[in-house]
Amino acid sequence: MTTTIESTSHSERLSCMEVWGGNNETDAVIDRPGVTCRVRSRAYGSAGGGGDVYFLSSCASGRLTRFLLADVCGHGESAAETAIGLRDLMRRNVNRIRQKQLVQSVNRELAAADMSGRFATALVGTWMSSTARMTLSNAGHPTPLLYRAATQTWSECVTHETTTVGMQNMPLGIDSRVSYSEFAIKLKPGDLLLCYTDALSESV
């Protein structure tokens, strides 16, 4: 996600309250107020859809944009079933103001669903255009990378704050009692937030 982008990828239009995405191959650019999102996904081999799923939604005013990037345990039909479940869960919870509540609700409902023990690592982000802040929650997912245009440097996007004791930030769907933290970063013009699954690191 960045404030500026040049790409030959096809553009998508996001309707208000729509949850866009899935686990199919795509190379799309979506412009939202204050931020541009590029989503690129390719399944392994000849598979039509993989275990990596992506979703993007926006409030009616466009001030708030949310994304969920997940790596589902399993492939093929099992991953597709879980992807559909995650999409429905995100649609039901997209209006929650606090991101931690959204993540915890999705986790509880996924853990309670009959998914045969399947789970997913996930990264959830909420972009507020009025403050230029991105709030992130990480559920056992690879750490995103942050590029600062002003200094032309990359760094891991992590927080060192401690939260409450107990099970924290585990993959979604393992245990309904897990709590999730969140932290915010301010993005400036030209900054880039790179979010990915372990498929990227494994292919390098």
Question: Which residues make up each language-model segment?
Answer:
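Conserved long alpha-helical elements within nucleotide-processing catalytic cores of c-di-GMP signaling
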Residues: 75-83
